[in-house]
Swiss-Prot record:
Classification via SMART domains: IQ
Protein's UniProt name: Protein IQ-DOMAIN 31
Cited Pfam families: DUF4005 (PF13178), IQ (PF00612)
Self-association state and partner proteins as the record states: Binds to multiple calmodulin (CaM) in the presence of Ca(2+) and CaM-like proteins.
InterPro entries (UniProt xref): DUF4005, IQ_motif_EF-hand-BS
Organism: Arabidopsis thaliana
Main location: nucleus
Lineage: Eukaryota, Viridiplantae, Streptophyta, Embryophyta, Tracheophyta
Compositional bias annotation for Basic and acidic residues: 357-373, 390-413, 435-472, 482-494
PROSITE patterns xrefs: IQ
Family: Belongs to the IQD family.
Phosphoserine: modified positions: S79
Length: 587
């Protein structure tokens, strides 16, 4: 029966005993007048290391007297016939004491062999019966366990078959009821039931289950084992039990394909744009919060607040065009104005103490004009008045500075520089620029008259007091900024395009920069940051180089610091320097 039988046999019957037990070791053979004690020795029981002895004692029984005699016999007197050993055993050792039996006959030996055989048979039969009883109990135990498992599996299979039959009946009935034939049959059966006043029996749908449970084998199986339950881990009270779950699943349309869920389009990029717009709003409001010491700071911060607002609207749609594309005519006029200023040294020397504070005043104007030009043109009209107010207040503060700074700037202006080396300039370029100037003046006589009326520079300003000079410089700054805007707008609207041969060359621009005009110095600082250009200016007709204003020297010294911030030159300062009489312009 395998290992399991041995294990169960050891458990039920105890430890197995060996055949060579102690009961077999000694046997008593009784005859009429003679008693002989023999021992049955196996090979494993023979002890080879017994002590040696020279004399062996033999026990003999006297038949007549019945007395036991002992004889000392040496090893040399013992023969092979006198040694008696058990059957089937042979040994070579002579240390075992021999037993002499001279008085036994052949008949007695046969009787003793028969008796020994019967005893062995009885003992072997007992052992065989004991093993059989153990195997019989093991077989019964196995049959009991296997029968229990088989019956339980059979009950579970029966319930499964009942569920499958019920599901098939439900599915087929549903399909038939939905078909055209089923609808007609249902109407006929319904009419018959209404006429006969009979109700439909719900158990008719489960005829197959009834037939299955009416089987004799199934009934016997369920009746014989009332405690046997099907193999499932659910209870009838649990909604997830077999029968209830089967009904719920069959009620659902399991034959229809499962509808695929619609893919939801992710709106992550839109959300990101909204988050960026919300995060940009508090940044703009933060720039608006800090307040400065004077009143004009509020106007300036409000104007700066509008700049990122406009750029945020137009970042992705369009980019602002560079001003260099639209200003070929304006650049030509700038060169002409600088020429007018170079030919008038008397006016520059008289206005020199006034321009030193104006240089510092015009620095903050650069930032405002930069934002005005880079932004859209609709903002020009709204931003003019606050900028003028800011400039006037800054001029008042700067006019109160000590005159020592003005003298220091004058000393710096009179220092010789490398500009004096370029006295001899090309006269052909001067004639070309003068001809261009005359052509532009003839085209726009009315516009120049309006600008001349607004310009009020006088060469004899030395006799006036310092207070009047400051007031005039303020008026000039406000007036020139307005006229400059009007001229720039007029040029864009009315002036025709100038041909390429009439435009100023790069060499003329470079020479203009070398003569130290404030226009060229400011323009170079801006163009170094953007596009490298060369400015040239023709020499005056009389061959004289005028002294430079302190504004020019300060621009040369601070050109590296403010070059990146200034994108365009100040139009107001250029017009103020170029305000001369027609007689001076003829030079």
């Amino acid at each position: 029966m395998g290992k399991s039988t041995k294990w169960l046999k050891n458990v039920l019957l105890g430890k197995k005993t060996s055949k060579s037990s102690g009961s077999k070791d000694k046997e008593r053979v009784v005859s009429g007048k003679e008693v002989l004690v023999t021992s049955k020795v196996e090979e494993s029981d023979v002890v080879s290391d017994l002590p040696s002895f020279e004399v062996a004692e033999t026990n003999t029984v006297d038949r007549s007297g019945g007395m036991l005699e002992t004889q000392n016999v040496g090893p040399e007197e013992i023969s092979d016939d006198e040694i008696e050993l058990p059957e089937g055993k042979s040994t070579d050792s002579q240390n075992v004491a021999p037993v002499q039996d001279h008085s036994l006959s052949d008949a007695e030996r046969i009787q003793r062999e028969i008796a020994a055989t019967s005893v062995q048979a009885a003992f072997r039969g007992y052992l065989a019966r004991r093993a059989f009883w153990a195997l019989k109990g093991i077989i019964r135990l196995q049959a009991l366990i296997r029968g229990h498992l088989v019956r339980r599996q059979a009950v579970a299979t029966l319930f499964s078959v009942m569920g499958i039959v019920r599901l098939q009946a439900f599915a087929r009935g549903r399909e038939i009821r939905k078909s055209d034939i089923g609808v007609q049959v249902y109407r006929k059966c319904r009419l018959q039931l209404l006429q006969g006043n009979k109700l439909a029996n719900p158990t008719d749908a489960y005829l197959g289950i009834k037939k299955l449970t009416a089987n004799a084998f199934a009934q016997k199986l369920l009746a014989s084992s009332p405690k046997v339950l099907p193999v499932h881990a659910y209870d009838t009270s649990n909604p997830n039990s077999n029968l209830i779950w089967l009904e719920n699943w069959s009620a659902s349309c399991f034959w229809k394909p499962v509808p695929q869920p619609k893919k939801t389009i992710s709106r992550k990029p839109q959300n990101r744009l909204l988050v960026e717009a919300e995060s940009a709003k508090p940044k703009k409001s933060v720039r608006k919060v800090p307040a400065s010491n004077f009143e004009s700071s509020s106007v300036q911060t409000s104007f700066e607040f509008e700049k990122p607002k406009r750029s945020f609207r137009k970042v992705s749609s369009q980019s602002i065009e560079p001003p260099a594309v639209e200003d070929p005519q304006i650049e030509l006029e700038k060169v002409k104005r600088s020429l007018r200023k170079v030919h008038n040294p008397v006016v520059e020397s008289s206005i020199q103490p006034q321009r030193s504070p104006r240089k510092e005043v015009e620095k903050p104007k650069l930032g405002v004009e930069k934002t005005r030009e880079s932004s859209y043109p609709l903002v020009h009209e709204t931003a003019e008045e606050p900028v003028n107010v800011c400039d006037e207040k800054k001029k008042q503060e700067i006019s109160e500075q000590p005159e020592e700074e003005v003298h220091a700037l004058e000393m710096e202006v009179h220092t010789p520089g490398p500009l004096e080396t370029n006295e001899a300039l090309d006269s052909s370029l001067v004639n070309q620029i003068d001809s261009n100037e005359k052509a532009m003046v003839e085209e726009k006589p009315s516009m120049e008259k309006d600008t001349k009326e607004e310009k009020t520079p006088k060469p004899n300003n030395k006799e006036n007091s310092a207070g009047k000079e400051n007031q005039k410089s303020r008026k000039k700054g406000s007036a020139t900024s307005k006229t400059e805007r009007e001229e720039s707008n007029g040029h864009h609207e009315t002036s025709p395009s100038i041909p390429s041969y009439m435009q100023a060359t790069k060499s003329a621009k470079a020479k203009l920069r070398l003569q130290g005009s404030p226009k060229s110095a400011e323009q170079d600082g801006t163009e170094k940051a953007t596009v490298p250009r060369r400015h040239s200016l023709p020499s005056p007709g009389n061959g004289r180089i005028t002294s430079h204003s302190p504004r020019t020297t300060r621009l040369a010294n601070s050109g590296d610091k403010t070059g990146n911030k200034k994108e365009k030159p100040l139009l107001s300062s250029r017009e103020g320097n170029a305000k001369t009489t027609p007689a001076e312009r003829k030079r």
